[in-house]
Amino acid sequence: MFDALVNGRIDCGELTFEVAYYDIEELNRRAEAGETDVSKISYALLPEIQSRYTLLDSGSALGRGNGPVFVARQGTPPDSIRRVAVPGMHTTANALMSRLYPSITQKKPVLFSEIAPAVARGEYDAGVLIHEGRFVYRKLGLELSLIHI
């Protein structure tokens, strides 16, 4: 998103950048603690930090039809889902799941790339997938799950 700035492709004068790469939960944590000047965050965190940060006009990743998916192992009865792996407690994915399924309270933050394999191994009843996890879950024997409320 900021390739030209951080890789010296444009003249920034005296301005320099220290670039660090973290998963979204760690980025959210650092922004919440005020540890960064510029950071990618989850939209769900914005209300908590907007007094200290300004939302930029570019670099956003919000779209229609490509949001998180809720998956479980094939054949898992929806009413048996209790333990759910989420990509972070302050993520938009967790906020959406919490709003749709308020009865699920046993949520555990897991690195987004490890959620689908952990659900496939039976470590969690279900998981909320973002990024590439949304496209590979079927290969791991997982399926979309809807919980009856």
Task: List the predicted regions and their residue ranges.
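Bilobed "Venus flytrap"/periplasmic-binding protein-like clamshell domains
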Residues: 1-8, 22, 66-125, 130-135
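Conserved beta-strand segments of alpha/beta enzyme cores
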Residues: 16-18, 54, 105-108, 143
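Small-molecule pocket liners
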Residues: 61-70, 142-143
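A ligand-binding cleft/hinge motif common to bilobed small-molecule-binding domains
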Residues: 28, 32, 40-51, 116-145
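Conserved small/polar residues in nucleotide/adenosyl-binding loops
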Residues: 147-149
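Extracytoplasmic small-molecule ligand-binding "clamshell" domains
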Residues: 1, 7-47
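A structural signal for short loop-to-beta-strand junctions that line the ligand-binding cleft
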Residues: 52-60, 83
